């Protein structure tokens, strides 16, 4: 009979919060209309990163070598690196949210009529935000991985 592994959810919460935000971002991308999608994605990304930073602050004095069956070691250095990643990610989200520097659609060539039509229709693609959150969660896990 198999036994379930014991996980330190409170110690893994900063990573899990960012992962959950990425999944919610994918759902927003799938089900929200394009007129409201950008504002929701930016707000969601910033909110998720701030919530994760708050959880990191809560666990700043804790440590564990068995947070995920020995594969994750939570210590002060890992928490510091995770906080650094989150703070830099907050700045990066604001840079990504500036849509003037990105093409409206990935398939449109810069300066082409397709790009002009996409800019006039304000049909910007926003899947970068959930992809970015998935990448941030991976970076956060990388800093505390011990296996």
Outline where the language-model segments fall.
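Alpha-helical transmembrane segments of multi-pass membrane proteins predominantly involved
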Residues: 1-147
């Amino acid at each position: 009979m198999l036994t379930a592994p014991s996980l330190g959810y409170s110690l893994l919460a900063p990573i899990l919060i960012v992962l959950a935000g990425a999944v919610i971002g994918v759902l927003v991308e799938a089900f929200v209309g394009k007129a409201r999608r950008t504002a929701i994605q930016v707000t969601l990304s910033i909110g998720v990163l701030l919530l994760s930073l708050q959880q990191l602050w809560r666990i700043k004095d804790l440590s564990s070598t068995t947070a995920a069956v020995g594969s994750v070691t939570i210590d002060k250095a890992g928490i510091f690196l995770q906080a650094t990643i989150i703070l830099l990610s907050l700045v990066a989200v604001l840079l990504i949210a500036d849509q003037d520097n990105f093409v409206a659609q990935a398939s449109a060539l810069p300066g082409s009529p397709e790009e002009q039509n996409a800019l006039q229709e304000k049909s910007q693609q926003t899947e970068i935000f959930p992809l970015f959150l998935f990448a941030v969660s991976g970076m956060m896990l990388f800093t505390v991985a011990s296996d």
